[in-house]
A protein has these predicted regions:
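Conserved non-catalytic scaffold segment of RNase H-like nuclease domains
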Residues: 2-99, 143-145
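Short, glycine/charged-enriched secondary-structure capping and boundary segments
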Residues: 23-26, 106-110
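Short alpha-helical "patches" and their helix-cap loops
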Residues: 42-46, 117-121, 172-179
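Active-site-proximal helix-loop-helix substrate-binding element of RNase H-like nuclease domains
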Residues: 46-47, 54-60, 67-70, 122-160
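Acidic, Mg2+-coordinating catalytic module of metal-dependent nucleases/exonucleases
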Residues: 91-98, 102-108, 136-179
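A short alpha->loop->secondary-structure connector
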Residues: 108-122
């Protein structure tokens, strides 16, 4: 198992819409630990200062999360606390960091948190960690699984690509070969 990827968590959000005023409705993290994909996700109860009018029926049709499901969800403060516990110092990556940074910032501000973790690009990180056939395995594994558009399963899908590539690299190391 490549130790570099065990120090990284993949982040994804589902959101009220894709507009500038959008807010996070679900967060997901996946990471590799002891040769397995681990995943945590949570719905997010809308904060009082988030614009409820920004709810998009088109986005809801994609992720399948209803506004009524969010009324019973944990608060932004609870979700942020759990997020940092689960993150445990890992670096963050995402396949859409330009969106995730905005939604992470909204979540943390609503929770009164001052932290502002950076989010690296999934593709750039994949190319930095893997090469050759292992890199091919990352993307072949991802392409074979359609994105479910739910935060936890979406991050798990990407992490499975890294797991497959890491297993290949570990096999080559046992054989005394390189990628």
């Amino acid at each position: 198992m490549d130790a570099a990827v065990e120090k990284i968590a993949i982040l994804d959000f589902e959101a009220s819409s894709l507009s500038e005023a959008s807010w996070p409705i679900e967060i997901g993290l996946s990471w590799l630990e002891h040769g397995e994909v681990r995943t945590w996700s949570s719905l997010i109860h809308p904060a009082h200062d988030w614009e409820i009018d920004d709810w998009s029926p088109q986005s809801a049709a994609v992720h399948g999360i209803s506004m009524s499901e969010l009324t019973e969800a944990p608060s932004a403060t609870e979700v942020a606390e759990t997020f940092f516990k689960v993150l445990g110092g890992r670096r963050l990556v995402s396949d859409a960091p330009e969106f995730e940074i905005r939604w992470l910032d909204r979540l943390l501000r609503a929770a009164g948190r001052a932290e502002n973790p950076s989010i690296e690009d999934f593709d750039g990180t994949s190319f930095a960690v893997f090469d050759g056939y292992a890199l091919d395995l990352v993307y072949e594994t991802i392409e074979r699984r359609p994105a479910p558009h739910r935060a936890g399963p979406d991050t798990a899908r990407l992490a499975r690509g890294w797991l497959k590539a890491s297993q290949h690299q570990a096999f080559l190391e046992l054989e005394g070969r390189t990628a």
